[in-house]
């Protein structure tokens, strides 16, 4: 926790917009920014650079996609469906059933990735899944046991879904143009690197932001 302020200083010095969050998670900020950019006609495509499963719910067609930098793979809507077996809109329901260790909720017993995908591919959301497995329109192995677990755990699985759903109303003040990277801030980054004894990092900066006084045609008075 003590390193968070330092991390914010370092990121800001690199010229990257920082979004401090209160009552929101970092993923909520990313989801909010992606949703806003999706509505902006000047934005050609939104790429979310995260391998986190919950970010898949933000994917929209081929316009809003996810990049797994470790596996070097892009996921559009078809890719999400291929990977998880459900549409992006069903990802929170899928995570609620399966669980997500990264976010600290266990999912429901007996439910696995394949069974959750098979059921949600048809019903899409938890509320639409009948309590009686005889009424299920899909054939799933162990349906009776799965239905019993779901029936007895409706309240908790709805809570898990609430935790899995990303918010798109985070208070981000910046507009899309404000987010454009213009280079690192030399006046801030150089003293910070000196303070940390990491001056070698300065050699890796390939673009410095132009301060107003250095812009062509600018005047000081």
Enumerate the predicted regions with their spans.
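Extended two-metal-dependent nuclease catalytic cores across DNA- and RNA-processing enzymes
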Residues: 1-173
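Low-complexity, acidic/Ser/Thr- and charged residue-rich accessory regions of DNA metabolism proteins
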Residues: 152-153, 157, 162-221
């Amino acid at each position: 926790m003590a390193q968070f302020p330092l991390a914010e200083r370092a990121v800001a010095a690199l010229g990257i917009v920082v979004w401090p969050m209160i009552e929101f998670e970092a993923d909520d900020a990313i989801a909010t920014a992606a949703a806003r950019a999706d509505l902006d006609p000047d934005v050609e495509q939104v790429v979310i650079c995260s391998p986190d499963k919950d970010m898949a719910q933000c994917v929209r067609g081929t316009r809003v996609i996810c990049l797994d930098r470790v596996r070097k793979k892009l996921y559009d809507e078809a890719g999400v469906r291929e990977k998880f077996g459900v549409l992006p809109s069903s990802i929170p329901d899928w995570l609620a059933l399966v669980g997500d260790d990264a976010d600290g909720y266990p999912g429901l017993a007996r439910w696995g990735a394949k069974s959750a995908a098979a059921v949600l591919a048809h019903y899409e959301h938890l509320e639409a899944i009948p309590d009686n497995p005889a009424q299920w329109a899909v054939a799933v192995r162990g349906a009776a046991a799965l239905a019993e677990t779901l029936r007895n755990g409706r309240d908790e699985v709805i809570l898990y879904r609430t935790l899995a759903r990303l918010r798109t109303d985070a208070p981000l003040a910046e507009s899309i143009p404000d987010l454009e990277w213009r280079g690192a801030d030399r006046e801030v980054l150089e003293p910070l690197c000196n303070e940390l004894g990491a001056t070698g990092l300065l050699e890796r900066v390939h673009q410095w932001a132009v301060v107003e006084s250095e812009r062509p045609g600018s005047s000081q008075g």
